[in-house]
C-alpha cells in the first residue's frame, strides 16, 4: 500500500499539471466555437427575417441614426474602467440594433488576423469576458457622416483570444462590421497607443464615418490602450477575399499556448521517465542485495 500511494500522488499531480496546461487552449477553442455558433445564428436570423418580411430594417437603421444625431459631444470614459459598473444602460440605446433582444448588435470581422467576434451593447464585464462590446456614449455602428463608434474587447484572456492580435494590423488593412442586413467596411488609417484616460482620439470628426477598435496594451501589462481607427470605404467582396489571412509576425495566442502545452508535456514525460528509471534502479539494487 505504501508503494502505491506515491504513484497515485504522482498521477494526480500529472493530471493537475496537464489540466492547467490544456485549460487555456481548450477554453479558447470552446469560446471560438461558441462565437461561431452565435454568429451563424445571427446570420440565419437576419436571412429568415428578411425573407419573411418580419422586420423593417429601414426603421431599425433610422432609429440608430436618429440616436447618433441626438448624442451630445462628451468625454468618453475608459471602457475597461467602467466594465464593472452596475448602472443600467439607457433603454433607447439598448433598443437600437438589437435584432433578437439579446443585446447582440452584430459582429466584427478582421480578415488580416482571421477573426470574427460578436459585438454586444455595453462594455460590461459579462460582455467583455466572451465578446466585444460597444462603448455606450460613442456613436452606434450604423454608419453615416459625423459618427465615431468604439468597439472594445480584451486582449490575452486565457479563455478567449478576442483582440489579442489586434496589434498586428497596419494602416491600409480592413475590418468589417456585419450589422443587421448590411456590411460596413472600414480601412485602418490611424493606429495609436494612449493613456487609459486619454480619449480625444475617440471624438467625432465632422463629416467622417469612423470606427475605432480598442483594447489594452502592452500584452500582459495593460497599462495603456491600443486604438485602431478606420474610416468607411465601399465594401468590395473581392478585395476582402484576397486579403491575406493570419499573415502576422510573432506568435498568436493559440500557437503560444500550444507551444507551452508541448513543452509542458515533454517536461512532464521526461520527469516520469527519470522517476521510473530511478525506481527501477532502486529495485535492482535491492534485488542484488538479496541475492548476495
Question: Where are the predicted features?
Answer:
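Generic N-terminal leader/processing signal
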Residues: 1, 5, 285-287
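C-terminal single-pass membrane-anchor helix
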Residues: 245-292
Amino acid at each position: 500500500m505504501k508503494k502505491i500511494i506515491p504513484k497515485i500522488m504522482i498521477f494526480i499531480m500529472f493530471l493537475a499539471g496537464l489540466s492547467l496546461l490544456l485549460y487555456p487552449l481548450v477554453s479558447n477553442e470552446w469560446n471560438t466555437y461558441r462565437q461561431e455558433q452565435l454568429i451563424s445564428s445571427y446570420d440565419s436570423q437576419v436571412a429568415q427575417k428578411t425573407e419573411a418580411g418580419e422586420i423593417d430594417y429601414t426603421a431599425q437603421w433610422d432609429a440608430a441614426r436618429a440616436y447618433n444625431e441626438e448624442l451630445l459631444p462628451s468625454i468618453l470614459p475608459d471602457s475597461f474602467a467602467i466594465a464593472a459598473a452596475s448602472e443600467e444602460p439607457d433603454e433607447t440605446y439598448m433598443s437600437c440594433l438589437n435584432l433578437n433582444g439579446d443585446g447582440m448588435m452584430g459582429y466584427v470581422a478582421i480578415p488580416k488576423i482571421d477573426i470574427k467576434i460578436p459585438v454586444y451593447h455595453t462594455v460590461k464585464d459579462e460582455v467583455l469576458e466572451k465578446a466585444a462590446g460597444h462603448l455606450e456614449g460613442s456613436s452606434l455602428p450604423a454608419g453615416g457622416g459625423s459618427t465615431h463608434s468604439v468597439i472594445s474587447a480584451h486582449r490575452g484572456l486565457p479563455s478567449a483570444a478576442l483582440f489579442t492580435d489586434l496589434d498586428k494590423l497596419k494602416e491600409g488593412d480592413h475590418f468589417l462590421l456585419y450589422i443587421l442586413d448590411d456590411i460596413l467596411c472600414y480601412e485602418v488609417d490611424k493606429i495609436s497607443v494612449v493613456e487609459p484616460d486619454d480619449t480625444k482620439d475617440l471624438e467625432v470628426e465632422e463629416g467622417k464615418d469612423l470606427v475605432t477598435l480598442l483594447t489594452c496594451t502592452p500584452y500582459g501589462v495593460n497599462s495603456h490602450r491600443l486604438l485602431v481607427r478606420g474610416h468607411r470605404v465601399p465594401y468590395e467582396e473581392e478585395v476582402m477575399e484576397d486579403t491575406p489571412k493570419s499573415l502576422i509576425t510573432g506568435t498568436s495566442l493559440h500557437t503560444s499556448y500550444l507551444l507551452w502545452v508541448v513543452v509542458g508535456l515533454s517536461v512532464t514525460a521526461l520527469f516520469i521517465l527519470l522517476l521510473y528509471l530511478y525506481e527501477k534502479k532502486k529495485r535492482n539494487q535491492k534485488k542484488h542485495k538479496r541475492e548476495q
